[in-house]
């Protein structure tokens, strides 16, 4: 009898381990059957996928970081994440508000006096962070190459719409927010990101400028004809699309958004600000950096919210007054691309579930969303409305 009682805990532990191992194997097979065909269809050299579910992190790596030396992708491979940098920039701006350095209601001119007399002088920092300043374009014109030409561009810019009435997705818009947030903290943007925000989030291998010692981990992106690419320098590139990171760090950021309780109070408040809804654009609610949808959500609705029209065209926007705090059932997401990289992240707080997909090929957003939605469905059978 004594022996039987002693073996019971061991047996239960073995059964529990077997159950976890089976769940891991099932998840591995679901991710494999989604990612491998995706890579084949779009000629993607390498991908890193990271999933957090019920507090557990899972990592899945495919292909190579570099075609020349066939270095395998790992969870430590550094990828360019393009505009998936924007939620990090937004978190910095929200942290600047949480620590009393600025408020999102401030005008751009309050923090950049050189804008005095321009159409952007009275645009709010919230307008800049939600792409509602009146129609700033996706990219700067080619002749904006230095701080002087950037200021000249902002000073002569003419709005298409009254501020706060339309959303036009824009690097010069949120890029200015990031620049002014860092300025309010008294440091250059790369310094405050690498020296303060990344460490506070536990992102120990995330960079604006990849240090020499980390270059062996930095993947090459690839063009459609498999020529190696790295992001091209440009004005406010760091603020709008400049983060290089790995799957582990990006999953930590997603986990911080799912469960910020372990972070300092100012950072908790900042993350809540990025989840707040400020404008409604169709079925999407624009937060700071993150874009929010009611959950569950169909594949078609999620693809529509990440369509070329949403990235390239002005869309009517309805201001939410007061701003709308995070509903109980929401999905947050953001895509990101550079010339040779494609990234995507989503998380669903009510399901304690998050996903990061990093690739060294800029492939269509619709394909990223389809793959992510398939994995989401494997984890939550109610992910799509019935």
Q: Where are the predicted features?
A:
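Short, conserved catalytic-motif segment at the N-terminal edge
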Residues: 24-79, 103-106, 110, 148-156, ...
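N-terminal signal peptide c-region/cleavage motif recognized by signal peptidases
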Residues: 16-18
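Short, gly/Ser/Thr-rich active-site loops of penicillin-recognizing serine hydrolases
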Residues: 282-284, 295-296, 362-386
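Active-site SXXK
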Residues: 35, 49, 55-57, 78-105, ...
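Short, well-ordered beta-strand elements
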Residues: 334, 342-361
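Bacterial N-terminal signal peptides that target proteins for export
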Residues: 1-9
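Short, surface-exposed loop or secondary-structure junction motifs
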Residues: 59, 66, 118-332, 337
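Cleavable N-terminal signal peptides
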Residues: 10-11, 21
